[in-house]
């Protein structure tokens, strides 16, 4: 049943629409109020999709996925329902801005800030992966950052749930995602899994550190081709002060072969936590990655220069010097 877009003052069940706040490929997003005045976000599929059984099933799957996830780093789902054959999803209202806006305001982020954001994202996605759910469209527009520094993943609209049947419909192609953040397997039309999310997280961490994505092009197809074929640019050639172990983490995330990436976000989160704690000896990125990251003659001084003395003591500095010396 087509009812047209909602406008301020409209009622949807017990919710009052305040304003439209987003228009995505598959749904409209509204700020709304409950009877007690609490603000929520309501997601409603486009009218144009309502006659498509596959689209309807996909939205219901998103509602099911939202109900399975309960983590401070994932936008919480309060409710869901249907009014006059129109399904809707009620989500937590988060007072924040997108990571894209953070990047616009700040440009390149300092390594500690970038790693903090990436670590929170990895922790959230570790929860999703542990529940058999892969996002498959992670990008700065789908990440909110609050004034207090909380980082929240949103929009599981094309997420994949383990064991679920494959849905196909006329609005959906096998190649789903956003070109700048698509893993090679997505470009090739494969479904993807947790390692696909790892790739997108790696792109976002690269972008926060470098101020740009690894690959750019005149059109989406040119960018997608580079994900499959082009070598990864060196972060430390862009900024020599980026520590080599941090570049190694990004490099592992962005392997072309999914089997060579972190298996899931839990592994990535552990390495990011170790970087924050400077526990280099416990990293999982592997000797070959470190050797490539520090093989230039200036590798050791650059690593040390990239880490503020205010964050480390003598023992941590010794670990860094010893690790690089024994793996150079």
Language model features with spans:
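Activation segment signature within eukaryotic-like protein kinase domains
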Residues: 117-118
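Conserved N-lobe ATP-binding subsite of Hanks-type protein kinase domains
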Residues: 28
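Activation-segment/catalytic-loop signature of the eukaryotic protein kinase fold
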Residues: 80
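Activation segment of protein kinases
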Residues: 53, 147-184, 188
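Protein kinase catalytic-loop region centered on the HRD/HxD motif
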Residues: 123-133
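C-terminal lobe helix-coil module of Hanks-type protein kinase domains
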Residues: 125, 178-283
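AlphaC helix of the eukaryotic protein kinase fold
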Residues: 46-68
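Conserved short submotifs of the Hanks-type protein kinase catalytic core
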Residues: 84-98, 102
